Design a protein with these regions (language model features):
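N-terminal targeting leaders
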Residues: 2-17, 23-198
Length: 198
């Protein structure tokens, strides 16, 4: 019975990985039709990059809590995009903020850069977190409605009123996204954590 369940789980996992890989292939094939020949979208993350980012996030979260017990009391979000790691939230001291950077750096050799935007402050309230979700939704909606901003390539993270923008974009796209976010009510500041194509 257990081996049957294990076998079924293995098949489900293999099928999910195959579908993810085929999804990436479909993107490539769609981009190869027409008279232009084969081109790549330099802004698109591969399925492997997405999995690697998830792995980085998991390793960092686990290590922060296991290697520094004081960080269990902190409010820390870890976001990885194409190997660029963003730390946001609140910690009790500058020492814990520095320790979070060190633990993050030691968690994976796949990390390209770390942006530590942790605040030395008490945890945000439930109301503040709800407001952050609302602000992020408004920013994403504005980006979707604006054809000059590649919303599918930009991640929006909001923490305590600050909006962090991540992705692999051109300087013009980054500036356009930041300008949109800046004009949303409830935004206290906008931080660009982009990788640039040009």
């Amino acid at each position: 019975m257990i081996s049957s369940i294990t076998s079924t789980v293995k098949h489900i996992v293999a099928s999910a990985l195959l579908l993810a890989a085929l999804g990436s292939c479909t993107t490539v094939l769609v981009r190869t039709t027409g008279a232009e020949g084969i081109t790549e979208d330099p802004t698109a993350r591969t399925a492997g990059a997405v999995v690697e980012d998830q792995s980085i996030e998991t390793k960092v979260v686990v290590n922060l809590k296991k290697l520094e017990p004081e960080l269990k009391k902190a409010n820390i979000k870890v976001i990885s995009h194409n190997g660029v790691v963003l730390l946001v939230g609140q910690v009790a001291s500058d020492g814990l903020k520095a320790r979070a950077t060190q633990i993050t750096s030691d968690s994976s050799t796949k990390i390209k850069r770390i942006h530590n935007e942790l605040e030395v402050a008490g945890k945000t309230s439930l109301l503040a977190r709800s407001n952050d979700n609302w602000v992020a939704t408004k920013v994403r909606t504005l980006m979707l409605a604006n054809s000059s901003v590649p919303s599918g390539q930009i991640r929006v993270i909001t923490e305590n009123g600050a909006v962090f923008l991540m992705g692999l974009v051109t300087q013009a796209n980054a500036d356009g996204a930041a300008d949109l976010a800046r004009n949303v009510s409830g935004v206290t500041r906008v931080v660009k954590v982009f990788e640039y194509l040009n």
